[in-house]
Amino acid sequence: MASNSSSCPTPGGGHLNGYPVPPYAFFFPPMLGGLSPPGALTTLQHQLPVSGYSTPSPATIETQSSSSEEIVPSPPSPPPLPRIYKPCFVCQDKSSGYHYGVSACEGCKGFFRRSIQKNMVYTCHRDKNCIINKVTRNRCQYCRLQKCFEVGMSKESVRNDRNKKKKEVPKPECSESYTLTPEVGELIEKVRKAHQETFPALCQLGKYTTNNSSEQRVSLDIDLWDKFSELSTKCIIKTVEFAKQLPGFTTLTIADQITLLKAACLDILILRICTRYTPEQDTMTFSDGLTLNRTQMHNAGFGPLTDLVFAFANQLLPLEMDDAETGLLSAICLICGDRQDLEQPDRVDMLQEPLLEALKVYVRKRRPSRPHMFPKMLMKITDLRSISAKGAERVITLKMEIPGSMPPLIQEMLENSEGLDTLSGQPGGGGRDGGGLAPPPGSCSPSLSPSSNRSSPATHSP
């Protein structure tokens, strides 16, 4: 009995109950659990030669059945069933799989990853209970991120994923030489040139001052406001020209170009004016040479924003940024994939990556003994965004204080800014009257759109 059991055919031997099994039996688990058809063994026995025994030995069956493998073909492998995922837990769009612990679409996956990796802090300008779905998901980043957490997306999964990638592709940071490659050098020069052509250095300006309200702070000096708003309009035009010269910017969709310009224009204006700060006189100089002290800046329209801007200017002084660094930092502020309502945020991120690399290499090559300067510069973007958010709020109050309407280009720059929607249709203070503001006849101010056939600024919403 023992010898018989040891020679019984097994699945590993390629047979089961006298029937041939495919060479790769693990591909066909249903076959391994099945029973042989009735009479199969009897039929096989009749086909075997009789050599004095009424019942052939198991070894004989194994030998014969092996020769029949060539006769009985293996059944074809059934096609795998397509995986069906639940809709995205965040916005109910079509899911692409399980990401960071939940079923999610590509858009919400990328948004959550960028938010965690960049430690983004968002603000809700409503009641922190915005409806998040496929249509509204880009309208409030704060509520979208909260929804990600509510449905179970994990911060740790993002960090672990990032650490895993770092382990798979180790980067020897300590061995980096920070050599300027021709490609990086060319990119830096293009950005430097774009910055210099649209923003002359302080040493190139013929400074002049005014005695208007230079001693005491008031709510608003109308003469200073008129001058300040005129200069601000010119600065916005120069910022648009700067953006057009940045490599790859005009390859983005028109809607994304407008979105990026509107989102970052105030950041760039503040960064630029702060590089023209003179600490000895506590003054700032505009592009036409007009130099205002802190009190005059307050009275010109900065109001409660004044001290924040001057404090930021003081923080820039130790960085000793040159034109290339200021231009690159401005470009990084502008070309940023986490801005609201972008159509192609991943493409914007791809354009930003070489700018970040160029700034890192340039800063560390220029200051080899101060490796901390690059992250310090990047952190200034967070400060800029904080000041800009307060700047947008200041524009709201300004619209109520100025006697006329807001200049059309300033109006367009903040047309869709967060927090300004509440003013739509409100009377007084130059607020929009449903139809919006059209530029004055013969105005040469371009709109924020890089295309030349745009309609009037107030009638276009990207």
UniProtKB/Swiss-Prot annotation:
PROSITE patterns: NR_LBD, NUCLEAR_REC_DBD_1, NUCLEAR_REC_DBD_2
Annotated region described as Disordered, given as residue ranges: 52-77, 419-462
Result of changing E415Q: Impairs interaction with ASXL1 and NCOA1
Tissue specificity: Expressed in monocytes.
GO molecular function: alpha-actinin binding; chromatin binding; chromatin DNA binding; DNA-binding transcription factor activity; DNA-binding transcription factor activity, RNA polymerase II-specific; DNA-binding transcription repressor activity; enzyme binding; heterocyclic compound binding
Required for binding corepressor NCOR1: annotated span: 404-419
Pfam families for this protein: Hormone_recep, zf-C4
Zinc finger (NR C4-type): 88-108, 124-148
Effect of K399R: In the absence of ATRA, abolishes sumoylation and is mainly nuclear. In the presence of ATRA, some sumoylation, cytoplasmic location, reduced transcriptional activity and no SENP6 binding
Variant or mutagenesis effect after changing S369E: Some inhibition of heterodimerization with RARA. On ATRA treatment, localizes to both nucleus and cytoplasm, increase in protein levels, and decrease in RARA-mediated transcriptional activity
Description of post-translational modifications: Phosphorylated on serine and threonine residues. Phosphorylation does not change during cell cycle. Phosphorylation on Ser-77 is crucial for transcriptional activity. Phosphorylation by AKT1 is required for the repressor activity but has no effect on DNA binding, protein stability nor subcellular localization. Phosphorylated by PKA in vitro. This phosphorylation on Ser-219 and Ser-369 is critical for ligand binding, nuclear localization and transcriptional activity in response to FSH signaling. Sumoylated with SUMO2, mainly on Lys-399 which is also required for SENP6 binding. On all-trans retinoic acid (ATRA) binding, a conformational change may occur that allows sumoylation on two additional site, Lys-166 and Lys-171. Probably desumoylated by SENP6. Sumoylation levels determine nuclear localization and regulate ATRA-mediated transcriptional activity.
Main location per the UniProt record: nucleus
Marked site: Breakpoint for translocation to form PLZF-RAR-alpha, RAR-alpha1-PLZF and PML-RAR-alpha oncogenes: T60, I61
Ranges of residues in domain NR LBD: 183-417
UniProt motif (9aaTAD) ranges: 408-416
Biased composition (Gly residues): 426-437
Outcome reported for the amino acid change (mutating E412Q): Impairs interaction with ASXL1 and NCOA1
Database matches in SMART domains: HOLI, ZnF_C4
Effect of S96A: Abolishes PKB/AKT1-mediated phosphorylation. Repressed transactivation
GO CC annotations on file: actin cytoskeleton; chromatin; cytoplasm; cytosol; dendrite; nucleolus; nucleoplasm; nucleus
Subunit structure: Heterodimer; with RXRA (via C-terminus); association with RXRA is enhanced by pulsatile shear stress. Binds DNA preferentially as a heterodimer. RXRA serves as enhancer to induce RARA binding to RARE. Interacts with RXRG. Interacts with coactivators NCOA3 and NCOA6. Interacts with NCOA7; the interaction requires ligand-binding. Interacts (via the ligand-binding domain) with PRAME; the interaction is ligand (retinoic acid)-dependent. Interacts with AKT1; the interaction phosphorylates RARA and represses transactivation.
Family: Belongs to the nuclear hormone receptor family. NR1 subfamily.
Function: Receptor for retinoic acid. Retinoic acid receptors bind as heterodimers to their target response elements in response to their ligands, all-trans or 9-cis retinoic acid, and regulate gene expression in various biological processes. The RXR/RAR heterodimers bind to the retinoic acid response elements (RARE) composed of tandem 5'-AGGTCA-3' sites known as DR1-DR5. In the absence of ligand, the RXR-RAR heterodimers associate with a multiprotein complex containing transcription corepressors that induce histone deacetylation, chromatin condensation and transcriptional suppression.
Disease affiliated with this protein: Chromosomal aberrations involving RARA are commonly found in acute promyelocytic leukemia. Translocation t(11;17)(q32;q21) with ZBTB16/PLZF; translocation t(15;17)(q21;q21) with PML; translocation t(5;17)(q32;q11) with NPM. The PML-RARA oncoprotein requires both the PML ring structure and coiled-coil domain for both interaction with UBE2I, nuclear microspeckle location and sumoylation. In addition, the coiled-coil domain functions in blocking RA-mediated transactivation and cell differentiation.
Name of the molecule in the record: Retinoic acid receptor alpha
Species annotation: Homo sapiens
